[in-house]
Structures are given as structure tokens and as C-alpha cells.
Amino acid sequence: MAYLKIVLVALMLVLGVSAMRLSDQEDQDVSVVKRAACKCDDDGPDIRSATLTGTVDFWNCNEGWEKCTAVYTAVASCCRKKKG
């Protein structure tokens, strides 16, 4: 009987901790994809002194964004928001 009480208390603790974790995760925006910066063609000739104005996007650029490099890759593109 004592083992049953211990198991039930342990299960309640696990459920309580998992319920607290779910509420913490709701506050985080998981729909935002983490992206890396990249160098557009007009950022300058040297990668060390260039301001990286582009953003790496998988496959093609999203709507409202344009490809800013002349280099073609099958997996990712360097994109930035359209001007104007």
C-alpha cells in the first residue's frame, strides 16, 4: 500500500511539472523561424567589412522578399525585403 502511495505522488508531481512546462511554452513564439544573415551583392566586395543585409531563406524567397545574389543554390537563397 505504501508503494502505491509513492507511485501516485510521483505521478502527480510529473503531471504537475509537465503542466507548468506547457504554459511556459505557450508564451514562446515557435512559428518564427531562426534565420542566418547573408551578404547581398551590393553589400560590398569584402565579407569582413560588409553589412550583411540579406537573410538566408530555404528554397525560394518568401512573398514580399527578393533574391539579392546572382549565385544560384538549390537549397537556399539570400533574400531581403523588397524596397518600396
From Swiss-Prot:
Localization per record: Secreted; Nematocyst
GO cellular component: extracellular region; nematocyst
Propeptide: 20-33
Modification sites for Lysine amide: K83
KW Acetylation (keyword) present: no
Primary location group: secreted
Cystine connections: C38-C78, C40-C68, C61-C79
Pfam assignment, any one: Toxin_4
Keyword vocabulary terms for this entry: Amidation, Cleavage on pair of basic residues, Disulfide bond, Ion channel impairing toxin, Nematocyst, Neurotoxin, Secreted, Signal, Toxin, Voltage-gated sodium channel impairing toxin
UniProt-listed InterPro entries: Myo_ane_neurotoxin_sf
MF-aspect GO terms: sodium channel regulator activity; toxin activity
Family: Belongs to the sea anemone sodium channel inhibitory toxin family. Type II subfamily.
Function as written in the Swiss-Prot or TrEMBL entry: Binds specifically to voltage-gated sodium channels (Nav), thereby delaying their inactivation during signal transduction.
Protein name: Delta-stichotoxin-Shd3a
